UniProtKB/Swiss-Prot annotation:
Residues annotated as binding substrate: 31-34, 85-88, 97-100, 124
Protein source organism: Haloarcula marismortui (strain ATCC 43049 / DSM 3752 / JCM 8966 / VKM B-1809)
Catalytic activity: aldehydo-D-ribose 5-phosphate = D-ribulose 5-phosphate
Function: Catalyzes the reversible conversion of ribose-5-phosphate to ribulose 5-phosphate.
Name this polypeptide is given: Ribose-5-phosphate isomerase A
Superkingdom of origin organism: Archaea
Assembly and binders: Homodimer.
A GO cellular component annotation in the UniProt record: cytosol
Pfam families associated with the record: Rib_5-P_isom_A
InterPro entries: NagB/RpiA_transferase-like, Ribose5P_isomerase_typA_subgr, Ribose5P_isomerase_type_A
Amino acid sequence: MKQGGSDAAKQAAGESAAEAVEDATVVGLGTGSTAAYAIRAIGQAVDAGLDVVGVPTSFQSRQLARDCGIPLADLDDVSVDLAIDGADEVASGNLIKGGGAAHAREKIVDASADRFLVVADPTKEAAVLSYPVPVEVLPMARSTVVTAVEELGGDPTLRRAERKDGPVVTDNGNLVLDCDFNSIHDPAALASDLAALPGVVEHGLFVGMADEIHVGTADGVTVRTLSK
């Protein structure tokens, strides 16, 4: 598992992406420590008079947005102009997400946005995706999905909770399998294979979705614009 980068790098990336938020827009609010800096920066802009509405991707981001005074809406009621979200790993513009077990809701919101900005620190960059892919599964399908993932060449592990007995349970009431495929040279093919498995709610491969990558360092931010 990758260790997280410095708080300064995360803050730089989050605040850089938040600067892209314009007045009278709807913003998808991502999950994780780097996205949290973007949410706080948006909250400060709201305090200064910026007119935005947020669509949170998790219980965590909803609570933080409320604390920051950002008005919220459900995806059923608005269209998302811009989404800002973090990543567990970034390679060639593709992502692995789901370290916070919120990747199903994140993918729905991020995919619906007109523009999707990824915020990360340098420790999340890689030449090839290799981070274990989180796969959210229906509880009754855990065993069958484990077998299917193994047939695809993966090594699935049920994610255990750290502060309670038993497994992690997602905001949707499901379980998470962390599936190690070693180096993923064809993320699009693997994404298609995982999505086709009965019982899989969503996987953490975000392929061809990002429009910009904001990578923060202690000295500044590098912004890469991607072509789709």
